[in-house]
């Protein structure tokens, strides 16, 4: 993980959480449901509508890949890398990008997964125009949805099965273990609450423009201002 104290991490993360949109949602207790169920954030519904992959499948996979305990519960964290089987989480996209460049000098791309859905750069990096873009949450999620849909189309009938293929196309124990994790994540979701039209419209706002919106919007996602190509 990014090297910093717990106090420093909290101070850096909390301002970001106040500006979330689309990809990190809230915890709710739905009528007739158990306590603490998560609603699926609108960004996942948006990508689902574009790709034909169920929003709950995308969100469960993202939770399985990059969960981080935040003040509003366990959520996927976009500034995540996995290198040679070890996970690293950073407080900003820039920190993750700088670390990625360093890792790329020491490891082959097939040992590096990036972003909110942990897309492997060696096998699927061709879907990104740059390594910086690979860390953009919506772009990363759309690529993940494309891979997940391909897995489903090759063996239709079960999105859980497709998730196992997403993680380990060769199948076997790694795929079975991963499917069990995705099932557990799926069980934490509130599938009865529909996403509103306003939330979908907010999710459609391009990332560079989201910092212009009121900062008290709970579902607002903001990208770091700086970029490095």
Features from the language model and the residues they span:
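N-terminal secretory targeting signals
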Residues: 1-53, 180, 184-229
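Catalytic glycan-binding domains that act on GlcNAc-containing polysaccharides
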Residues: 32-192
């Amino acid at each position: 993980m990014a090297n910093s104290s717990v106090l420093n991490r909290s101070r850096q993360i909390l301002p970001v959480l106040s500006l979330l949109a689309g990809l990190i949602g809230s915890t709710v207790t739905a009528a007739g449901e158990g306590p603490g169920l998560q609603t699926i954030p609108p960004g996942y519904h948006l990508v689902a509508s574009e790709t034909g992959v169920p929003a709950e499948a995308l969100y469960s996979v993202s939770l399985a890949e990059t969960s981080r305990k935040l003040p509003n519960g366990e959520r996927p964290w976009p500034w995540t890398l996995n290198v040679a089987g070890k996970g690293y989480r950073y407080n900003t996209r820039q920190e993750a990008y700088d670390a990625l460049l360093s890792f790329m000098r020491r490891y082959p791309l097939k040992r590096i997964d990036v972003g909110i859905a942990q897309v492997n750069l060696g096998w699927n990096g061709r879907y990104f125009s740059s390594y910086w873009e690979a860390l953009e949450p919506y772009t990363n999620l759309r690529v993940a949805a494309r891979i997940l849909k391909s897995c489903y189309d090759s063996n239709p009938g079960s999105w859980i099965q497709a998730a196992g293929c997403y993680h380990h196309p060769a199948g076997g124990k790694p795929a079975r273990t991963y499917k069990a994790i995705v099932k557990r994540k799926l069980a934490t979701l509130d599938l009865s609450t529909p996403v509103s039209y306003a939330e979908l419209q907010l999710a459609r706002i391009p990332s560079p423009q989201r910092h212009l919106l009121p900062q008290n919007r709970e579902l607002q996602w903001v990208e770091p201002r700086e970029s490095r190509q």
